[in-house]
Amino acid sequence: DNTFEDVFAGIGSHSMMFDKPYKNITISNNRFNNLKKRAIWCLNYQDTVVTGNTMTNVGGGVYVRSVYTRNAHTVSGQEVSPEGNQYAENILIADNQITVLEPTVIDGKQWNGYGIWITGEVSLGSAGEIIPSEDDDPENTANPTTNGIPAGRYIIRGVTARNNTISGNCDGIKFSLAEDCSCRGNTVRLSDSHTYNNMGI
């Protein structure tokens, strides 16, 4: 029951510890108004629910991602492997109301909004990374850094997007590098449907 208004971004993480996921997170019944970027970012979350939130005039609704190489960290001496526990999974996104702002420019980069974006990552390891989908991925604006994250495909799995309502000039619901996910009962009503950045699902 929190309210976020006229701020840059809402709830969530923009960094992570490799192989140490966030677990048992509940983000419910919050209100987000007039946010420049995303309302909710679930980065390397597991066993999480995002339900009953109202997001009005936001740059993005709910962003779920397995790994974000450019902002992932390791503990000194930690042995890392792409087989570790860094696969975001078992996440429910349900009964949210999302209205997305017009596309804009943030820090000199084009920002195209989305209602719900569920994505994994293909990492090149210390040399950098491959972005998970389109070249205009709004989350990939930093320069690659050498941070010891091993190369690999970090798939997102077991995410359900259910009974959400999405409107605005944006992409509705996007999946990339995902498996065993489901999308059902959602309502997507977009404006300017003749443009490339206004895809339903």
List each model region and its residues:
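Long, low-complexity, intrinsically disordered polar/charged segments
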Residues: 9-10, 25, 95, 99, ...
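Short glycine/acidic-rich loop motifs that flank beta-strands on beta-rich extracellular proteins
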Residues: 6-14, 36-44, 58-66, 86, ...
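Short, charged, low-hydrophobicity "junction" segments
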Residues: 33-34, 38-42, 52, 57-81, ...
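Intrinsically disordered, low-complexity Ser/Thr- and acidic-rich flexible linkers and loops
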Residues: 15-19, 67-87, 103-112, 120-155, ...
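Right-handed parallel beta-helix
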Residues: 1-39, 47
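Solenoid scaffold repeats with emphasis on beta-solenoid/beta-helix
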Residues: 2, 20, 24-25, 43, ...
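Flexible loop/turn segments at secondary-structure boundaries
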Residues: 8, 48, 70-71, 124-125, ...
